[in-house]
Amino acid sequence: MSFTVVESRWPDVWLAATARGITICGDFLAATALALALQGAGAGGLAVSGLLLAATLPLVVLAPLAGRLADRVDSRTLLVTVGLAQAAICALLALADHPVLVVGLVALLACGLAVTQPCLAALLPAMVRSRDLPRASAISQTAVSLGALGGPVLAGLLVGQFGTRVPLLLDAATYLALVVAGLLLRTRRGGRRTTAVVTPADPRGTATAWRLRRDPLMLVMVVSTAVVIAAIGGINVIEVFFIRETLNGSPTTYGLVSAAWMAGMLPGGWLAARLANRLGDDAALIRGVLVTLAACSLMVLLAAMVPGAGLLVPLWLVAGAANGGENVFANLLTARRVPEAMRARAYASYGAAVQGGSMAGFLVGGALLTAVPPRPLIAGAGVAGILVVLIFVPVVARAVRRPSPGDPGVRQPRPADADAGLATPDGPAEPKPEAGDTVGSWLSASHVPGSGTSSS
């Protein structure tokens, strides 16, 4: 059974964003503490690499299953159950000493994130009407960015005073914010009943017929973003060597540069939200995604030319703003085109592509760094990102012209149960309102496009 609420539920938006920001802060706090714990225990680079892989791989491998689960199970049940499980896992992490046990617990934690991230991302469009989604996305991204900025700072204070156990216990407490949000949110989706502000999608198909591979614009967005991230993602491995060794920057400078990208995402998300309201069609949104990806790549290319580390700060601020804009455009495009009943799967697929691209960038950047100096590697990453965008420009042009299932004049397959549930033969897989559209690994401080997207 489904019913429609005409007005957007802003208290739900703020509650979900606050819970997400708190957990992100705890995650970045724990990431710093765990890295220090492994280093202090004498673990080498292999253990740290295993930690990063454990935090990322489940988000990629479990995406199809996790997205389906988030679409079919009541969101309140998922947030409360998984939030409690993640809090317990973080508490065990505070007591774990052996690197293998730490890596295993991190992998379990990431399994929970594979479910909660698409669950929260799919809830956001259900909380507001379509015209309010850009603003809601900006609010959510602001909370995530503030959490990601505050976590490492808090870690620097707590680890020096109390060691690693207190930060990990604090991270466990932050997951209780998900539990509270799950209990208090009026908006619910999944399960047998949906209580939502139903956003009219342009899904190019019914809930049973929609597939990512059949939606050319969505497919282009996912693939182009993943490939650009793979191209420039290696800077997260190279950056510390470039700043500290090539540019002779201080640890303080390195910290400022690292924070600049995330800081730039704050105004970038809000600027994109204002612009998104003027973009009346999906083609304009996918072009916005390409423009922002190109801007990120250009800033990376320019970074290879700077004579001093301090000049990286303004470049990273601009790149972060473009990254924030890309997140808003991608969230809005997904909410517009994907039926409500399948949005968690779509967000999970997008998140898996982002994480897969990040993993590829880490591996390639780390491998090349053993043989090539940092400066030419950063320049190569920027050039590669720009080339990828240029390659996808004609692909987008063809995708815009190509009819999608659900476009006028394209016959829809009528499922046997077309008159039941959300799917209808003549419209989106959700009822229309009576009146009157965010995803990244918790352990990675990555600041390439897609990071800090909540699926956000």
Write out the residue ranges for each language-model feature.
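Alpha-helical transmembrane-bundle signature of multi-pass membrane transport and export proteins
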Residues: 1-415, 427, 455
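Short, intrinsically disordered terminal tails adjacent to the first/last structured region
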Residues: 1-3, 408-456
